[in-house]
Amino acid sequence: MLVVEGLTCRFGTKAAVDDASFAVAPGGFVGVIGRSGAGKSTLLRMINRLAEPTAGRILFEGQDVTALRGRELRQWRARSAMIFQQFNLVGRLDVLTNVLMGRLAEMPPWRSLVQAWPERDRALAMSALEQFDMGGVAAQRADSLSGGQQQRVAIARALVQQPDIILADEPIASLDPRNTRIVMDALLRINKHFGITVLCNLHSLDLARTYCDRLIGMSSGRIVFDGAPASLTENIARELYDLEANEVMGAASAPQPAGRMLPALGTAAAA
């Protein structure tokens, strides 16, 4: 279980995250929602330890993540895989090598320098690509792919880390509606098929209500809602987004996963 206790991050006098506390049981798909600047990205980056908390603790299976250093910290970052809005692929390298980068924490430094990837890791990376219909582009340069394809490669890279939890920071922010659906379906598949906990920052409330089984709403660095999507009221939506509720709750329909079933494979390779 992931437990966040009184987590705070200050930049000067401003609190990007202010006294956040919650727990996430294994296997949940949790959407972190709110306006830009609400503290969503900082929260996920603190959980991964890419940003340092000013106060509070992060516990995972009883281990104090905020106290980790050196090798133990690197191991935690492998167990809590990040997926970024910008994809963070190496464009000049082929797709398979980009996915194999997710295995670096398990390799001796000399192997990574000469790219001497073990066959079991290569097989794992190909299997991850095939999960998302990307096996056919394994030899292509990453920068030759569309945005939706690149994000699926980034998700495959996270999957080969064999993480306990995936932290997805606005993974669909730069994608069109079709690729938004494909990427969100990929995250849903990881969650339901592999049982990996997912925390996903989303600006769109409609998407969050469609895909997530729990929502954590943030405003000005503080958690103002924590519950099931059906429990989110119009008043809370106004507080989260500082908008008229009908501008946030259903003005445009989100892409729908088919019947909340696991997304089918074999239909997304060209996206």
UniProtKB/Swiss-Prot annotation:
It is an enzyme of class 7 (translocase). SMART domains: AAA. Belongs to the ABC transporter superfamily. Phosphonates importer (TC 3.A.1.9.1) family. The complex is composed of two ATP-binding proteins (PhnC), two transmembrane proteins (PhnE) and a solute-binding protein (PhnD). The keyword Membrane applies. This is Phosphonates import ATP-binding protein PhnC 2. ATP binds at residues 34-41.
